[in-house]
Amino acid sequence: MLAKRIIPCLDCDLQVPNGRVVKGVEFKQIRYAGDPVELATRYYEDGADEIVFLDITASHERRETMTHVIEATTENVFVPICVGGGIRKPEDYFKMLKAGADKCSTNTAAIKNPELINEASDLVGSQACVVAIDAKRRYIENPRESDERFIIEVDDGYCWYECSIYGGREFTGIDAVKWAMECQDRGAGEILLTSMDRDGTKMGYDIPLTRTMSENLDIPVIASGGVGEPEHIYEAFTDGKADAALAASIFHFNEYPVPAVKEYLRSRGVPIRL
C-alpha cells in the first residue's frame, strides 16, 4: 500500500511585499498566519510530504501568481511543491515548473476552459496537473429529483455538491463529483478537494464527499477543509479513502506539529513516512 501524504497548505495573500500566509473560516474571516517562505521551510524540516501554495486572490484579481515566492522557497525546500491560483494557460504551468514547482493546480481556469486540462497534461504530464475543486453542499428533499446531479446521503439528509470559482466568490451550477470525473478523463493527475462547508471549522473533513470522490476516481484525491485534530486526518484516510490530507490551521498555529500527526497516524496503523 502506498504511503499516505501529509500536506500543509499555505493560503497566500500577495497584496503585501513578499506575501503573507492567511487562514479563514468557510473562505471568510481571514487572519494572518505567517511568512510563506519561512512556514514552508519549517514544514519541510518537520517532515511534510508535500507543500501546497494557493494564491487566494490571483484568480479573483485576474493576475499571475507567485513566481518569486516559489523561487525563494525552493532554495531550501526539497519536497514536492504544488502551486495554485492564477494558472490560466498551458504556458503558466511551464513557468511555475521552471520556477521550481513540481505541480500546478487550477480551479477557475479549468472550469472556464476545460480544454486547459488536456493541453496542460499534454505539455507537462498528468503528474503535474492538479485540479482543485471547492465544493459546497446543496441539500435536496427528494434524492430522485434529479438525474443530472450526483446525490450523496449525509448525516442530515441528501445533497449534491456545487463547484465554486474565484476563491468561493461565485458558484457555477456544476456538480463536483461529475466534474472531477471529467477532469480525470481529460488528463488531470490529482484532485485537490476542498469542502467549503468545513473549511477552517475544525469539525473534520467532509467524509461523505471525500469517500464518494475517492470511490469514483482512479487518480489520487487530496482531502481538504475542516481538520482540527489528528483523528480527523485518520478518518480522511480510513473512512474517506483519501490518498493525502491537506491541513492549514493545525499546523500554522502550532496546535499539532507535523511530526506529532505522523506519529499518531503510524500508531493507528496508517502507512506514513516518518
From Swiss-Prot:
Specify the superkingdom.
Archaea
Report the enzyme's class at the first EC level. Answer: lyase
Query: In which pathway is this protein known to take part?
Result: Amino-acid biosynthesis; L-histidine biosynthesis; L-histidine from 5-phospho-alpha-D-ribose 1-diphosphate: step 5/9
Q: Does the keyword Cytoplasm apply?
A: yes
From the UniProt record, list the reaction(s) this protein catalyses: 5-[(5-phospho-1-deoxy-D-ribulos-1-ylimino)methylamino]-1-(5-phospho-beta-D-ribosyl)imidazole-4-carboxamide + L-glutamine = D-erythro-1-(imidazol-4-yl)glycerol 3-phosphate + 5-amino-1-(5-phospho-beta-D-ribosyl)imidazole-4-carboxamide + L-glutamate + H(+)
InterPro entries named in the record: Aldolase_TIM, His_biosynth, HisF, IGPS_HisA/HisF, RibuloseP-bd_barrel
Where, per UniProt, does this protein localize? Cytoplasm
Q: Which GO terms describe its biological process?
A: L-histidine biosynthetic process
**GO MF term list:** imidazoleglycerol-phosphate synthase activity; lyase activity
Q: Write out the catalytic residues in the record.
A: D11, D134
Return the EC number.
Answer: 4.3.2.10
Keyword Cytoplasm attached: yes
Q: Mind listing the UniProt keywords for this protein, alphabetically? A: Amino-acid biosynthesis, Cytoplasm, Histidine biosynthesis, Lyase
An annotated GO cellular component of this protein is: cytoplasm
Question: What residue ranges are annotated as transmembrane?
Answer: none
Assembly mode = Heterodimer of HisH and HisF.
NCBIfam families on file: hisF
Sum up the protein's function in the record's words: IGPS catalyzes the conversion of PRFAR and glutamine to IGP, AICAR and glutamate. The HisF subunit catalyzes the cyclization activity that produces IGP and AICAR from PRFAR using the ammonia provided by the HisH subunit.
Family of the protein in this entry: Belongs to the HisA/HisF family.
The identity of this protein, by name, is Imidazole glycerol phosphate synthase subunit HisF
Q: Which organism is it from?
A: Methanothermobacter thermautotrophicus (strain ATCC 29096 / DSM 1053 / JCM 10044 / NBRC 100330 / Delta H)
